[in-house]
Amino acid sequence: MSTRAGQDLRDDEVVRVRGLSKTYPAVRGRRGAPGVPEVRATDAVELDVRRGEVFGLLGPNGAGKSTLVRQLTGLLRPDAGQVEILGHDVVRHPERAARILAYLGQESTALDELTVSLAAETTGRLRGLEVRRARAERDAVLEELGLTPLAGRPLKKLSGGQRRLACFATALVGERPLLVLDEPTTGMDPVARRAVWAAVDRRRAERGTTVVLVTHNVIEAETVLDRVAVLDGGRVIACDTPAGLKERVADEVRVELVWREQAPLEVPEVAALRERAAESGRRWTLRLAPEEARAVVATVTGGAAFAALDDFTLATPSLEDVYLALGGAARQGLVKA
């Protein structure tokens, strides 16, 4: 049964979030251990997810992505705000979330003792499928993802990428209209990643399945997302298509310089660049106007600095550049080290 508020959802809306806030209280330190300060994990978050799209939540560690997802899936009650999924108020009725979505979290240890086959079948049974249909869906999903040869192996004995793919398989059994995937391709090789996104695309085309994807892999985000909300400090600081977001920094070029051992700071032009560069070990990253970028490349490749240069790249802006341009607090960027 839909809630009264849910009747106001647009026809193409699957998820509606309004004013969602969650604060973790401060924890006092014990026996000399430092305490933990109060954390505003989500701060008045508002967003909509449309039917059939892959909607991304992008941000660095601590941005509030996983806390937001736990509230979307009914696993964590917010302090304030609304979450409606297909017309259901999952703040007031969190038990309904399991009937309308499949959630793949970062950790899925509950299935570790089961074989790949039994994990998929059991998940289907828990989602209300009768035995014959659960087994049929299990077999189809394992074949689709290339997991049939591993069907009899316990998840705990698989490699990290294989285990992650097996857990993704369980999310597909039962054909939920909404998939909430928290970094689903972590540890996977390129073949497995392609299998994941092919499976997602197939369900979008055939069933109108909607996906909420948590990631801080900007390369993956730019490839698979229809729209993306950029989070920082628990707030949504931007929401648009990847192309729309990158338009905000269209007048910049990213220059990356990698030095062989250390930057030749005795070269005046290099010393001057250091003030504008983000340094990470031997790598310097600069975000410059196109004319400046060309001048920098000419300087380091045509002068005394060239002997110290190991590599350089000149690239158009990425979503990470957008995040930094918007004032994101994690100055080292979005991608996991």
Residue ranges and their predicted role:
Residues 73:
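Helix-to-loop junction immediately C-terminal to a conserved catalytic motif
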Residues 81-92, 96-97:
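Conserved ABC transporter NBD signature motif
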Residues 179-183:
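Catalytic Walker B motif of ABC-type/P-loop ATPase nucleotide-binding domains
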Residues 16, 20, 121, 125, ...:
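Conserved ABC ATPase "signature" region
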Residues 173-177:
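A short, proline-enriched helix->beta-strand linker immediately N-terminal to the Walker B motif
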Residues 197-290:
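ABC transporter nucleotide-binding domain
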Residues 60-64:
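Walker A (P-loop) phosphate-binding loop of ABC-type ATPase nucleotide-binding domains
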